[in-house]
UniProtKB/Swiss-Prot annotation:
It catalyses: a triacylglycerol + H2O = a diacylglycerol + a fatty acid + H(+). PROSITE patterns: PNPLA (PS51635). One of its GO terms (molecular function) is triacylglycerol lipase activity. SUPFAM superfamilies: FabD/lysophospholipase-like (SSF52151). This is Triacylglycerol lipase ptl3. The gene is ptl3. Gene3D superfamilies: Cytosolic phospholipase A2 catalytic domain. Residues 141-340 form the PNPLA domain.
């Protein structure tokens, strides 16, 4: 089979297993599989990894629990021996160095041994796994905005769900919040059903599905009479049906997922808000999604609604004198700092489908010098435009508009792992149209295929964290059952 035929197999694979099999074949043909089998590389400390691997294995097999525990405390961090170096995952298609994969598997076996060993008391295990949780930190999955292209996130979530790699912290902005919230208010079993049947649901968020789309003249008239092009009531109706009547606190209690939604304020001096069960426990999730999807000029700014946990009375959520909110992507598409502050997040998986952003995202660690030069040029151009917008804002020329535009340009739109599904730019005209079932199926497929290329790095970066968190939860439950 030729290289081009294998690439086509990868491009049109129907499952991750099929894609991985083709990726390994391509690595063999290109000589990259041999690179994976060779432990040597300047990109990480392979000597330290190999020696630590042998030490961990020796202590686990000989059941030297105390010595093993001491070693693990210094071995579970993602950046141990520089193993999180993105260059290690940019060369071969099917994964990184086999030594790194072997090390991760050994750490997982050691953690399982610690959870099950009779050498430690239950309280000791809880204490040690709590410390290990702090050492590894937390991963957050962030789903960007992108209009109907945001439905590509369905496939991203499907792939991560199938591999058992969905983080407990999920954040969404604008269209990404629709998928994030629909998933995070449900438990794992319900999530699986939702993701499988998402394309059959009602997502008529822009216009009445039973009426003809408004003409250009009607849209212009609507804008000048109401200040927006589309009626927000359709978005509200669909979100209530899709998400239900849960508050952020209720969603967390129900599913265990820490759901976050970013919203922007329309004024000049208000900071963007990150809504979750800590900052806005009683806010209704559907209203947060409506607010973050309220694209300026397209929809009117929205009101956040909260429900009193005692009286069940619903009222406007107002933490400022300006209770109207809009598209979270304007100020904070990827809220790195706030998530780090609130939830000890030190690792970000970003699914980026903003069609106006994706062409400009380039890997700074790329081996391709042309890509590196292009990225430098784009960064310099963005800085110049940003300074111009800032100057206009400081001179009082449309201050709010130019401040928001500057925010859009200067934001960071990528993460430690950035998933960029292939977008169909021929369908840009559908970005603010009600998505059809066929469009949703195609978007989900693109999302899945875009995620498969990142499964090896995601698994190696997150497997230890996920096992530690699961073991800690089991130990806590066991402790409570004994009381």
């Amino acid at each position: 089979m030729s290289k081009n035929e294998i690439k086509l197999q990868m491009e049109y694979a129907s499952s991750y297993e099929t894609w991985l099999e083709a990726a390994e074949k391509l690595d063999v043909i290109e000589g990259k599989y041999q690179w994976r089998e060779q432990k040597e590389s300047d990109e990480y400390d392979y000597v330290l990894v190999e020696s630590r691997l042998h030490e961990l294995r020796r202590h686990r097999l000989s059941k030297n629990t105390r010595l093993l525990l001491g070693l693990l405390r210094n071995s579970v961090a993602r950046d141990f021996a520089n193993m999180d170096n993105s260059r290690l995952y940019n060369y071969a298609h099917s994964g990184t160095k086999k030594l790194i994969d072997e090390f991760i598997q050994e750490v997982l076996m050691c953690l399982t041994y610690l959870e099950e060993t009779p050498d430690l008391s239950l309280d000791e295990k809880i204490t040690e796994f709590s410390r290990l949780k702090l050492t590894t930190g937390n991963t957050a999955l962030i789903l960007s905005g992108g209009g109907t292209f945001g439905m590509t996130h369905i496939g991203v979530l499907q792939s991560l769900h199938e591999q058992g790699l969905v983080p407990k912290i999920i954040c969404g902005s604008s269209a990404g919040a629709i998928v994030a919230c629909a998933a995070a208010v449900r438990n794992k079993e319900e999530q699986e059903i939702l993701l499988r049947q998402f394309h059959t649901g009602d997502l008529s968020v822009f216009t009445d599905p039973n009426a003809a789309p408004p003409s250009v003249i009607q849209s212009v008239k609507q804008y000048f009479t109401r200040g927006c092009v589309l009626d927000i009531s359709h978005l509200e109706r669909v979100m209530k049906l899709l998400i239900g009547d849960f508050t952020f606190q209720e969603a967390y209690d129900r599913s265990g997922y820490i759901l976050n939604v970013t919203v922007s304020c329309g004024s000049l001096f208000e900071m963007p808000s990150l809504l979750n069960y800590i900052t806005a426990p009683n806010v209704l999730v559907w209203s947060a999604v409506v607010a973050t999807c309220s694209v300026p000029f397209l929809f009117k700014r929205a009101t956040l609604w909260e429900r009193d946990p005692l009286t069940r009375e619903v009222s406007a959520f107002c933490v400022t004198d300006a209770p109207l909110w809009m598209d979270g992507s304007v100020d904070n598409d990827i809220p790195h700092a706030k998530l780090t502050e609130l939830f000890h997040v030190n690792h970000f998986i970003v699914s980026q489908v903003n069609f106006h952003i994706v062409p400009f995202i380039m890997d700074p660690t790329s081996h391709n010098w042309v890509e590196r030069c292009c990225k430098k040029a784009i960064d310099l151009a963005a800085q110049e435009v940003s300074l111009t917008f800032r100057l206009f804002a400081e001179l009082g020329i449309f201050s709010v508009l130019f401040t928001k535009l500057q925010s859009v340009i200067t934001q960071k739109y990528s993460g430690d792992i950035t998933i960029i599904p292939r977008l169909n730019y021929r369908e840009v005209n559908k970005v603010i149209k009600n998505p059809t079932p066929s469009f949703l199926l195609d978007a989900a497929t693109r999302g899945k295929r875009g995620t498969w290329t990142k499964v090896p790095v995601t698994r190696n970066h997150c497997a230890i964290e996920i096992l530690i968190a699961a073991a800690y939860t089991r130990l806590i439950k066991r402790s409570k059952s004994l009381k």
